[in-house]
Regions:
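Structural motif
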Residues: 42-51
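Alpha-helical segments flanking ligand/cofactor-binding loops in enzyme cores
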Residues: 51, 55, 77, 97-100, ...
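Short, Lys/Arg-enriched N-terminal segments with co-localized hydrophobic residues
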Residues: 1-4
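Glycine-rich phosphate/diphosphate-binding loop of Rossmann-like nucleotide-binding domains
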Residues: 9-27
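C-terminal binding/interaction regions
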Residues: 8-10, 14-15, 93-155
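A short beta-strand-loop structural module common to alpha/beta enzyme folds
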Residues: 32-43
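Helix-adjacent hinge/juxtasegments
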Residues: 52-90
């Protein structure tokens, strides 16, 4: 299921195996994937990967991104520092749906120490199908961007 999408993926060493599994899963479904690393299980600085991935989205190359680390939390914190990016951790179907329908998040963060690969694949099936549409949440998402712009201008 799901329309074909351009997706950028990234991880730290803790989630390298999960990233490889999910990358293949998404490619097998006909999605276009770019991998910003890491490419092995050597120690890495996950914020560098998050930064790289978010740039691919903010510059318009990719619609959505998936960031994987031990819990997804560090990746989400870092991604949300990038102006224009909305990222969330989701390991359940309701959060996954709301992160897009309510918050128009472009970046899904998951933890390799939290979720089994098979469960992550099932979540991705839903994630690919869900779209953001203007509606009751639009003023809220707009307000998020206003808050972001306020602090960006203060620097």
């Amino acid at each position: 299921g799901g329309i074909k999408m351009k997706i950028v993926v990234g991880c730290d060493e803790a989630a390298y195996k999960l990233k490889e599994t999910l990358k293949k899963y998404l490619e097998d479904k006909g999605n276009e994937i770019v991998d910003v690393g890491v490419y092995n299980e050597n120690p890495s600085l996950y914020p560098e990967t998050a930064d790289k991935l978010c740039k691919e989205i903010t510059n318009g190359n990719y619609e959505r991104g998936i960031l994987l680390c031990g819990t997804g939390i560090g990746m989400a914190i870092t991604a949300n520092k990038v102006p224009g990016i909305r990222a969330a951790v989701a390991h359940d179907i309701f959060s996954l749906e709301r992160m897009i329908k309510s918050n128009n998040c472009q970046v899904l963060c998951m933890g390799a120490r939290i979720i089994a690969p098979q469960s992550a694949e099932l979540l991705l099936d839903t994630w690919l199908d869900i779209k953001y549409h203007d509606g009751p949440s639009t003023p809220k998402v707009n307000r998020i961007m206003e808050v972001e712009n306020h602090y960006r201008c203060m620097r």
